[in-house]
Amino acid sequence: MIVTLMNLLRACWRPSSNQHARAGSDVAGRQDGLLWYKDTGQHVNGEFSMAVVQANNLLEDQCQIESGPLSFLDSGPYGTFVGVYDGHGGPETACYINDHLFHHLKRFASEQNSISADVLKKAYEATEDGFFSVVTKQWPVKPQIAAVGSCCLVGVICGGILYVANVGDSRVVLGRHVKATGEVLAVQLSAEHNVSIESVRKELQSMHPEDRHIVVLKHNVWRVKGLIQVCRSIGDAYLKRSEFNREPLYAKFRLREPFHKPILSSEPSISVQPLQPHDQFLIFASDGLWEHLTNQEAVDIVHSSPRNGSARRLIKAALQEAAKKREMRYSDLKKIDRGVRRHFHDDITVIVVFLDSSLVSRASTYRGPSVSLRGGGVNLRSNTLAPYASQM
C-alpha cells in the first residue's frame, strides 16, 4: 500500500509530453525558481500558454493539456482537453486526477464515439470512484488521505463546441471580441461551488435542512461544517462517507455528530456551447489567480499583450497584486521560499487557450497537432527542463 501511495506522488512530479525534450528546448517547459512555464505551444484549435507558480511546500495544483485524439478510436473524435486541478490538504487527489481523468474521458468517448456532457459526467464519476478505492486501501496506514481533495475544472473543445465541467472554485473565462466597440469582453463560463457565494450557501442549506450548522462563518470566512470552503470536489472522503470520519483521522477533521448522506458532492456543473468566430481565447485558472485579478483584468492583460508568455504574464500580475496587498515589493516576494510563500499567495495555475476560428470550426475528425503536457513544480526532474529564458 505504501508503494501505491509513493507511485501516486511520484507521478505528480513527472512531466509528460509525447515529444522528446531536447537539450535547451522548452518542449517540457522551463523552470525559474518556483515558477514553471510553457510560453507557447500548438493545439488542435490554435495556440496555448501555460504557467504554474508554487506557494505550498508540496505543489497542490496540477494541470494538463491534451490535444489530438479524445478517444481510443482512429475515427476520433479529435480536439483539445484542458484540466486544472487545485488540490487541498495535500497533492494526492490532484495527482490522481491528472493521471486518470483524461483516460476515463477517452474510454467513455470511445464507447459513445463522441464527446458529450454525459461522457464528462461519467469521467468524473469514474475518477471519484477510483480515488475512493485508493483511500480505502490507504486508510489503515495513512488515514489522513481521507481529508485530501481537489477542485477539478475541465474544458474540451471538439467540433466547434466547448464543453466545460467543474467542481470547486477554479474558473474559466472567455475573451469575446465585441465588434461594435472593439472591446474584448470577459465572459465567465464555469459555475463555482464556494460557500462564500450566497446562492451556493442557500443551495447547500436547502439540501441539508435538518443541519443548522451545514455552513459556518469561521474567522470571517464561510466554510462547510466549519472545515472547507468548497461544497463540491473530488476526494474529501471524510465529508462524503461516515466510515472515513472517525479515528484515527485527526480530530480537527472529525465531526461531532454522525452524518447519513454525503455532505460534499462530486457531481460537476456542466455547460455546452458552440464557439463563435468572435471568441478569441479562454483563460483556465485555479482560484489563486482569481483572488487577485478580476475576470476583466485577466482578459485585458491577455488581449493587450503578445500571445507568447501570456500565462506567465497573468501570474506575474497576480503576484504583483499579492505583494501590493502586503505592502511589499514584488522582487522581495519572489525571494520567499515555498511553504512560507503560502502566507502571501496560493499555488497558481494558468492555461490560456487561444482560439483560431478557422481551426475551431473544423469537424471533430480533424486530427491537428498532437500534444500531451503537464504543468510542474520544483519537484520535477531538472534534466527534463530547459533553463529559464528571462526574468518574470
Swiss-Prot record:
It catalyses: O-phospho-L-seryl-[protein] + H2O = L-seryl-[protein] + phosphate; O-phospho-L-threonyl-[protein] + H2O = L-threonyl-[protein] + phosphate. This is Probable protein phosphatase 2C 60. Its cofactor is Mg(2+); Mn(2+). The lineage of its organism: Eukaryota, Viridiplantae, Streptophyta, Embryophyta, Tracheophyta. One of its GO terms (biological process) is regulation of intracellular signal transduction. Binds 2 magnesium or manganese ions per subunit. It comes from Oryza sativa subsp. japonica (Rice). The chain crosses the membrane at residues 145-165. Its main location: membrane.
